[in-house]
């Protein structure tokens, strides 16, 4: 009933209409997968079945019904064999390959948003592989850019009874919060083994944590004491819930915190994402305008150079122009040229015929006078 009430409260408060994405992170052995299994069963029992995504390519069996399973897309063993990688390298490469198709996953989530109020994403056991990889960043930012996204950090309470180990977990939680910049919930799992009240006391009471540290005599305790002062402000705004993934206790409080985190996303994180998207769009449009302006200037320069070259070369005819000019002379000019040629030809012939005729007449007269004198 808590899940349904939280969802109804979220809708009534004008909260997000999209499904809330719960990105489950945690150290290996902290109980992430068991937590997702319990969460899935709880939501099914409440009549609000979640949309579940498994991003662990190395898991042998998934103990919950997954709508999308990375193992159906990427074969972890084949990736290791083909690229000659170890276990962690195989997980990173598998996530990288899957991230190239994550736009299709986003489309599936959008189609299912009317049927599912929550999207559960189970990540690989090697937390650093997902948190600090490029593919993990792509997946996280893709979800956060479209849907209310909450990071759930699952912590093994039974292994955090030592102040130094507890501080290490808190430092890792702080680094993930700083990296993702999303609403954050620390789930202290395995409360069926040990109650998480000691951890809450350490977070709220600095002196109680100092008393626990005084029992440690190693040099690490001095470093932990210094870091606890730095993280004191971090604790004040941190959402903490104690949960038993085996027994299912603490889930009601968890969904109350999820509702609060989703409202925080809509109130603080979504405007920031919209501002970033708008600034990126403005920068892109400005870049396009600058490119168009440079192109316009280049085209104007080319046109000006072409006009200058044409003016400077106008007295000189192109060979094609010469051919056209020779082929389009006026007929009168052609006839005049032809008549002139004929006159010149006749004048030349007459000039040669007149001396020959005079010689012929002289020879004839000479012969005539010669015959008469005889």
UniProtKB/Swiss-Prot annotation:
Which molecular-function annotations from GO does this UniProt entry contain?
ATP hydrolysis activity; GTP binding; GTPase activity
Task: List residues modified as N-acetylalanine.
Answer: 2
Where, by residue number, does GTP bind? 29-34, 189-192
Q: Indicate the principal place this protein occupies in or around the cell.
A: cytoplasm
Q: Which residues carry this modification: Phosphoserine?
A: 301, 312, 314, 338
**A GO CC term assigned to this protein in UniProt:** cytosol
Location in the cell reads: Cytoplasm; Nucleus
EC number assigned by the record: 3.6.5.-
| Residue ranges with Basic and acidic residues bias | 343-354
Question: What SMART domains does the record point to?
Answer: AAA
Give yes or no: UniProt keyword Magnesium: no
Q: Where is the composition biased (Acidic residues)?
A: 330-342
Q: Where does motif Gly-Pro-Asn (GPN)-loop map?
A: 86-88
Q: Which UniProt keywords apply?
A: Acetylation, Cytoplasm, GTP-binding, Hydrolase, Nucleotide-binding, Nucleus, Phosphoprotein
The protein's matches in InterPro entries, at most eight in alphabetical order, are given as: AAA+_ATPase (IPR003593), Gpn (IPR004130), Gpn1/Npa3/XAB1 (IPR030230), P-loop_NTPase (IPR027417)
Q: Where is this site: Stabilizes the phosphate intermediate?
A: 88
Query: Which tissues carry this protein?
Result: Expressed ubiquitously.
Q: Locate the region Disordered.
A: 326-354
Which residues carry the post-translational modification Phosphothreonine, per the record?
328, 340
Subunit details for this protein? Heterodimer with GPN3. Binds to RNA polymerase II (RNAPII). Interacts directly with RNAPII subunits RPB4 and RPB7 and the CTD of RPB1. Interacts with XPA.
By sequence similarity, the record places it as follows: Belongs to the GPN-loop GTPase family.
Q: Which purpose does this protein serve, as stated in its record?
A: Small GTPase required for proper nuclear import of RNA polymerase II (RNAPII). May act at an RNAP assembly step prior to nuclear import. Forms an interface between the RNA polymerase II enzyme and chaperone/scaffolding proteins, suggesting that it is required to connect RNA polymerase II to regulators of protein complex formation. May be involved in nuclear localization of XPA.
User: Mind telling me what this protein is named?
Assistant: GPN-loop GTPase 1
Q: Name its species.
A: Homo sapiens (Human)
